[in-house]
């Protein structure tokens, strides 16, 4: 015996990413690296990149859900920038969050002022 103790025959556990531990799709390690390299603070806590990755994943999922609905309403199976624009601008909270953002190839929301619409003519009853 070479003095390795009781756990000599046990293999090391399979490595599990921080994204997998947190149950996220977005990369926690990459977010952590960006936080460190971006000079936002001298030190970055262990929970900060997990929280930020979760927030980013939630926002992406929310926008994609609404854009998918917009694509389906237009009888399309592929999301294009127009669908993203319609999704963001028709949602009050996302519109406020992304008010300063221009979506390339997004177009504008269809909107006709009420004054410009033709007047309703009612038939005079006798």
UniProtKB/Swiss-Prot annotation:
InterPro entries, per the entry: Histone-fold (IPR009072), Histone_H2A (IPR002119), Histone_H2A/H2B/H3 (IPR007125), Histone_H2A_C (IPR032454), Histone_H2A_CS (IPR032458)
Compositionally biased region (Basic residues): 7-19
One GO CC term on file: nucleus
GO molecular function terms noted in the UniProt entry: DNA binding; protein heterodimerization activity; structural constituent of chromatin
Post-translational modification: Monoubiquitination of Lys-120 gives a specific tag for epigenetic transcriptional repression. Phosphorylation of Ser-2 directly represses transcription.
Sites of the Glycyl lysine isopeptide (Lys-Gly) (interchain with G-Cter in ubiquitin) crosslink: 120
Record PTM Phosphoserine, positions in chain: 2
Start and end residues of each stretch annotated as Disordered: 1-20
Organism superkingdom: Eukaryota
Annotated localization: Nucleus; Chromosome
Family: Belongs to the histone H2A family.
Function: Core component of nucleosome. Nucleosomes wrap and compact DNA into chromatin, limiting DNA accessibility to the cellular machineries which require DNA as a template. Histones thereby play a central role in transcription regulation, DNA repair, DNA replication and chromosomal stability. DNA accessibility is regulated via a complex set of post-translational modifications of histones, also called histone code, and nucleosome remodeling.
PANTHER family given in the database record: HISTONE H2A
Complexes and interactors: The nucleosome is a histone octamer containing two molecules each of H2A, H2B, H3 and H4 assembled in one H3-H4 heterotetramer and two H2A-H2B heterodimers. The octamer wraps approximately 147 bp of DNA.
Protein name (database record): Late histone H2A.L3
Higher taxonomy: Eukaryota, Metazoa, Echinodermata, Eleutherozoa, Echinozoa
């Amino acid at each position: 015996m070479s003095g390795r103790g009781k756990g000599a025959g046990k293999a090391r556990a399979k490595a599990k990413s921080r994204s997998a531990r947190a149950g996220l799709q977005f990369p926690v390690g990459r977010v952590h690296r960006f936080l460190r390299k971006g000079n936002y603070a001298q030190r970055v806590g262990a929970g900060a990149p997990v929280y930020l990755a979760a927030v980013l994943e939630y926002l992406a999922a929310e926008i994609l859900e609404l854009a998918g609905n917009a694509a389906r309403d237009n009888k399309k199976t592929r999301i294009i920038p127009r669908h993203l624009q319609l999704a963001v601008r028709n949602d009050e909270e996302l519109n406020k969050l992304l008010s300063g953002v221009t979506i390339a190839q997004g177009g504008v929301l269809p909107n006709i002022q009420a004054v410009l619409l033709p007047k309703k003519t009612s038939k005079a009853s006798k």
